[in-house]
């Protein structure tokens, strides 16, 4: 059988090499620097006789789309992941862009989120091409940019422009082999307070932007429950977290500006909408303007992703669960609609904009994403490649046409 031949050819060493190659190419976002890794992926497929499509919404941030055509073009299976990573930050024991193998794990920025998953896609694709596996349906691979900042230039763009169309999809984000169907909505709030830049000696008459910001944030924390109050199913609670505060230049200069960002997460099975959360948030700010003399504050709301859940009876759910059981020995836990995952991903774009049932499923533990000393278990890479291979054969390979090489 063709399946057995491909499964036998899955190589741990090859998966490690591909993962290390990808991790060694920095693609931090911000600022958004995916050009080099996109070139690596494009050349990977060009070297195997394929012609990947390169498309950009923002110059210098290329998405790579590979289309392997089948005989009937139905169904079409999508395998996808993002090429950007968050900045490495501090606290590493090794160089985050010189990946190392230790204790059956690969260490480096992006190993888990999600270049290990990308390596699995590349390896499965090269084996399908190597063994000349005939497809009945189409296989589309999309390597997209900008996921770490919402995905508008990546998955959002390729879906809106109809550059990617499929009947079902798998997003290789780190889920530790949970099968995720529901995700919380993400609302980012950016606050900027304005004051008077002057010497500390003038504090009695100056407006201090940092002091005004701390007063606003204290009020928001006090009113958190009123902003987030809602009726919902399960144990998922909305979240409001102040995650960045930046202000001031020197110890003896009163700051003229201070910026803060706030991350709000809203579960899908909740009657709190993005719009109502914004309105409640704005009400708190309005009251603060009346209470703080001279307060000058700007607010910007960015809806990164609305909460959503996909149907459990989608065809890809059953196929993927069955293939995972063949490899792992147990059925994967299905997450959604309740509870949902706290994470947000490009599945939002593929499902809500493209109506492509797209399961969030892949190697790695989410606790490792964005962490110092990020790592992924090599065994999970092998298992993922095995699962993806089985999914391909179950969905878009006509077994009657498979011949041994």
Task: Identify the meaning behind each predicted range.
Residues 12, 89, 133-134, 180-186, ...:
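Short glycine/proline-enriched loop/turn "hinge" motifs that connect secondary-structure elements
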Residues 67, 74, 209, 229-232, ...:
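An extended, acidic, His-containing surface patch that forms the Zn2+-binding/catalytic region
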Residues 18-21, 25, 40, 44-48, ...:
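Generic non-transmembrane alpha-helical segments
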Residues 106, 111-112, 116-222, 370-389, ...:
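Fold-level recognition of mixed alpha/beta catalytic cores in primary-metabolism enzymes, strongest
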Residues 154-292, 298-300, 304-305:
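Midchain, well-structured core segments that form catalytic/ion-binding scaffolds
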Residues 86-102, 166, 181-192, 359:
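Acidic-glycine-rich active-site phosphate/pyrophosphate-binding loop
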Residues 2-109, 130-135, 355, 365, ...:
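Acidic/His- and Gly-rich active-site-bordering loop/insert found
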